[in-house]
């Protein structure tokens, strides 16, 4: 549902807009108690069984947008409970990052194969013959699946000549490539933090908007209000994210208008990272010191490797991620600035909270959250005309935003600066496929390879914090790549 302007996205956007307005207008945070009535007006529910439930859900969304955790559902409480703790101009984060709002969950049934009304009770009944657990029988003249015996292999569905067997899927669980979505005592979805790698795919695939992440936009705006020098570093996926008329130069001008002191392309850090990883590959993999090299720019991919495949930790590149490399570059000229990563990625919020990174990056917001900030300041790119040149990076770094772009950039650097070096590359996208690739690498099937992993199917342009359809985003990124030079220069690696 990414890129489709559904009611779920409309509510999320409105929440971010209102929180941003509270920040810019420096309103009393106790007034947040009134917002559910402004966002959900009237007396009749539109999407739920009760307008009171709709407002309660909005209240929980407001808390998450302030960086706070959900309130307990079984105790009397207020939206603004402990609000003073988040009323600061520094990064505020209460784990976990992603949470299921219990009152918003539809309690969708778990995965199962179901016989539909198209079943003809045919003589061949191939479904019964292929079932490895003998879970299918005839009942009242039709096929019947015993869910207690079924192992959900799907063989029956494949062989039914009438297409009468369908797969029921729980959208959030189906989108999760690591099996982190479980079920609580009431049949609602819950996220197992020990399994989750914070890609956010469950969030964007829930049709009821029951899963949300925490935001830092209020604290960011408060820092601006206090006079801090705040620099935005834009992830390569930013082009096209704010509409067809929002050119890179207009986006930079708009960012300056809403309070940022300067704007950088994170592709600058990606250019440096591509060179560094090219060097790493040539010196370590091409010489046989390492069996393979895994890219490290996608935090969900890196987290997957470290959490599920600790044996490959040494093969994960130790090059600075583009976010960190760009933040360091920006601090060379502005050592006292607060650095804000603006990108498509939910997991970057966790990366920036790590002990080794938190001093480099002060805030992380998504394109979706930035759109809410633009709304709060009434920036409409259909009529906005200001421009400021934004042309910091080369094509290799800009291409990091699309799947295979990272490996392609590194290979381009190897071909350019280490001619004659043979390089084998592979890439995967989506956590389920990433797990398969790591299993292959672990078992020795990827010797000599440079392997790029992207947690989101499609790459960064398909991240949970994006605003437009993936295909449109890919087109815009590739166009922006062509507008730059093809390769980075060696001196870029100083960052």
Spell out what each predicted region is.
Residues 98, 102-112, 122-127, 153-156, ...:
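Cysteine-cluster motifs in flexible loop/terminal segments that predominantly coordinate metals
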Residues 54-90, 97-98, 108, 122:
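Core subunits and conserved enzymes of cellular information-processing
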Residues 124-147, 155-192, 197, 201-216:
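Iron-sulfur cluster-binding cysteine motifs and their immediate structural context
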Residues 1-73, 213-495:
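Iron-sulfur-associated redox domains of electron-transfer enzymes in respiratory
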Residues 87-116, 133-134:
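N-terminal [4Fe-4S]-dependent radical SAM core
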Residues 115, 146, 192, 234-235, ...:
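A secondary-structure boundary/capping signal
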């Amino acid at each position: 549902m990414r890129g489709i302007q559904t009611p779920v996205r409309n509510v999320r956007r409105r929440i971010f807009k209102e929180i941003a307005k509270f920040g810019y207008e420096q309103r009393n945070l106790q007034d947040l108690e009134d917002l559910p009535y402004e966002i959900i007006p009237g007396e009749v529910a539109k999407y739920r069984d009760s307008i009171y439930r709709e407002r309660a859900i909005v209240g929980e969304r407001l808390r998450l947008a302030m960086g706070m955790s959900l309130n307990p559902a079984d105790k009397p409480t207020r939206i603004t409970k402990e609000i003073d703790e988040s009323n600061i101009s520094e990064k505020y984060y209460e784990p976990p990052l992603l949470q299921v709002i219990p009152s918003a969950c539809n309690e969708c049934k778990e995965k199962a194969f179901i016989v539909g009304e198209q079943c003809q009770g045919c003589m061949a009944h191939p479904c019964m013959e292929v079932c490895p657990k003998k879970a299918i029988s005839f009942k009242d003249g039709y096929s019947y699946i015993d869910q207690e015996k079924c192992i959900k292999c799907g063989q029956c569905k494949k062989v039914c000549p009438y297409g009468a067997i369908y797969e029921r899927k729980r959208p959030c669980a189906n989108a999760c490539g690591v099996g982190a979505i479980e079920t609580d005592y009431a049949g609602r979805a819950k996220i197992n933090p020990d399994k989750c790698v914070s890609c956010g795919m469950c969030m964007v695939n829930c049709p009821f908007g029951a899963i949300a992440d925490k935001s830092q936009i209020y604290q960011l705006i408060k820092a601006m209000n206090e006079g801090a020098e705040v620099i935005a570093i834009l992830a390569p996926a930013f082009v096209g994210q704010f509409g067809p008329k929002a050119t890179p130069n207009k986006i930079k001008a708009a960012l300056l208008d809403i309070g940022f002191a300067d704007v950088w392309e994170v592709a600058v850090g990606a250019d440096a990272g591509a060179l560094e990883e090219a060097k790493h590959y040539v010196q370590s993999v091409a010489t046989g010191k390492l069996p393979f090299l895994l890219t490290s720019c996608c935090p969900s991919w890196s987290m997957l490797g470290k959490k599920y495949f600790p044996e490959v930790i040494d093969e994960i590149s130790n090059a600075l991620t583009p976010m960190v490399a760009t933040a360091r570059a920006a601090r060379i000229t502005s050592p006292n600035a607060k650095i804000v990563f603006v990108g498509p990625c939910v997991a970057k919020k966790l990366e920036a909270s790590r002990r080794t990174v938190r001093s480099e990056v002060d805030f992380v917001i998504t394109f979706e959250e930035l759109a809410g900030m633009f709304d709060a300041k009434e920036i409409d790119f259909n009529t906005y005309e200001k421009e400021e040149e934004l042309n910091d990076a080369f094509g290799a770094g800009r291409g990091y935003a699309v799947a295979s772009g990272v490996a392609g950039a590194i290979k381009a650097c190897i071909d350019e600066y280490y001619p004659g070096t043979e390089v084998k590359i592979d890439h995967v996208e989506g956590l389920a496929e990433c797990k398969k690739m790591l299993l292959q690498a672990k078992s020795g099937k990827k010797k000599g390879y440079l392997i790029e992993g992207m947690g989101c199917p499609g790459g960064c342009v398909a991240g949970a914090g994006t605003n437009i359809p993936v295909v449109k985003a890919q087109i815009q990124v590739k166009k922006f790549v062509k507008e730059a030079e093809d390769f980075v220069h060696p001196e870029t690696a100083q960052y």
